[in-house]
Swiss-Prot record:
An example molecular function term from Gene Ontology annotations: hypoxanthine phosphoribosyltransferase activity
Name under which the protein is recorded: Xanthine-guanine phosphoribosyltransferase
Enzyme class, UniProt record, top EC level: transferase
Compartment(s): Cell inner membrane
Binding site for guanine: 92, 135
Family matches, as NCBIfam families: PRK09177.1
Any one Gene Ontology BP term: IMP salvage
Glycoprotein among keywords: no
Organism annotation: Photorhabdus laumondii subsp. laumondii (strain DSM 15139 / CIP 105565 / TT01) (Photorhabdus luminescens subsp. laumondii)
Gene Ontology cellular-component annotations: cytosol; plasma membrane
Annotated GMP binding sites: 69, 92-96, 134-135
Domain of life (superkingdom): Bacteria
Record PANTHER family: XANTHINE PHOSPHORIBOSYLTRANSFERASE, XANTHINE-GUANINE PHOSPHORIBOSYLTRANSFERASE
Gene name of the record: gpt
Amino acids binding 5-phospho-alpha-D-ribose 1-diphosphate: 37-38, 69, 88-96
Length: 153
């Protein structure tokens, strides 16, 4: 990955609220299935904005910090996804999204961010991201003190 796209907590909440507006009316949904771990925070934000209390998870492992690795389904919510929103933070190459589509063929699959290779696999997303860009999510970062330039002389 050559570029990095840094996401702040404020940006994430704004994007999640935009996505929630597109998911109205709320009465059409039975619940949310968040893809662990990237979809956990967006799932919580959507649950709050839509007033949805039924939240479950599907646990799929495909990343090890900066590297993609073999896909493993560790745990899944029951059913075919009918009436459920499945949410992840992003769709990248489409590997995880393809697995989600196979597990939950009737779900409405959404992400906050989408890269070109994975876009066709989601029903909706908010932000386009170039394929060669790594997304730094706010839960993966910490705030640190940076001394003024004049002190580094």
């Amino acid at each position: 990955m050559s570029e990095k796209y840094v996401v702040t907590w404020d940006m994430l909440q704004i994007h999640a609220r935009k996505l929630a507006q597109r998911l109205l009316p709320v009465e059409q949904w039975k619940g949310i299935i968040a893809v662990s771990r990237g979809g956990l925070v967006p799932g919580a934000l959507l649950a709050r904005e839509l007033g949805i209390r039924h939240v479950d998870t599907v646990c799929i492992s495909s990343y090890d910090h900066n590297n993609q690795r073999e896909l493993k389904v560790l745990k899944k919510a029951e059913g075919d996804g009918e009436g459920f929103i499945v949410v992840d933070d992003l769709v990248d190459t489409g590997g995880t999204a393809q697995a989600i589509r196979e597990i939950y063929p009737k779900a409405h699959f959404v992400t906050i961010f989408a890269k070109p290779a994975g876009q066709p696999l989601v029903d909706d997303y908010i932000v386009d991201i170039p394929q060669d860009t790594w997304i730094e999510q706010p839960w993966d970062m910490g705030v640190v003190f940076v001394p003024p330039i004049c002190e580094g002389r």
